[in-house]
Design a protein with these regions (language model features):
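NAD(P)+-binding Rossmann beta1-loop-alpha1 motif at the extreme N-terminus of oxidoreductases
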Residues: 1-47, 51-54, 60
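Short acidic capping loops at alpha-helix termini that bridge into adjacent secondary structure
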Residues: 27-30, 87-89, 111
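Rossmann-fold NAD(P) dinucleotide-binding segment
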Residues: 50-107
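General beta-strand structural signal in soluble alpha/beta enzymes
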Residues: 54, 93-94, 111-117, 154-155
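Internal alpha-helical scaffold of NAD(P)-dependent oxidoreductase catalytic cores
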Residues: 102-111, 127-155
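Active-site capping/gating segments
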Residues: 114-129
């Protein structure tokens, strides 16, 4: 199982991915990424050397799953990833307007986190608001905060 799965890898997903690798949070081989287009997958693989998934469900078979897609795509993407999520997976959403309870209901996950990153994350200087669901223990929260701090500060 991969340590981190990115479902979507646009501007913000790439910023977070770059931070994770630059900070040494994990190796490129520990990360799997899915994207809407093969062009994006090829570019991300070439730039970062990460594993690429043939579908969103494969990217969701990770210890921590980052949902980095546009809010209007959440319904369809969650339908793809929910069956693949491990019962212990930490599901991280960056979509505005999607509450913790909505995410828990739609994904079936126990460990849900909402992040509100900003664009300076692209240069490692982001300030990210973090909201934890009830299912995370202190070790889970520490993992999430280490992830957030790889591309800036978190609170």
């Amino acid at each position: 199982m991969h340590k981190i799965g990115f479902v979507g890898c646009g501007n913000m997903g790439r910023a977070m991915l770059s931070g994770v690798l630059s900070a040494g949070l994990c190796e490129s081989g520990d990360i799997i990424v899915s994207a809407r287009t093969q062009k994006t997958l090829d570019a991300v693989h070439e730039e970062f050397g990460v594993n690429v998934a043939s579908n969103n469900g494969d990217a969701a078979k990770a210890e921590m799953v980052i949902l980095a897609v546009k809010p209007q795509m959440y319904e369809s993407v969650i339908a793809e990833v929910a069956p693949s999520l491990s019962s212990e997976a930490i599901v991280v959403s960056i979509a505005p307007g999607k509450t913790l309870s909505w995410l828990a209901e739609k994904t079936g996950a126990k460990k849900i986190v909402r992040l509100m990153p900003n664009t300076p994350a692209a240069i490692g200087c982001g300030m990210t608001s973090v909201a934890y669901g009830d299912g995370l223990d202190e070790a889970d929260k520490a993992r999430v905060m280490a992830f957030v701090q790889s591309f800036g500060e978190g609170e």
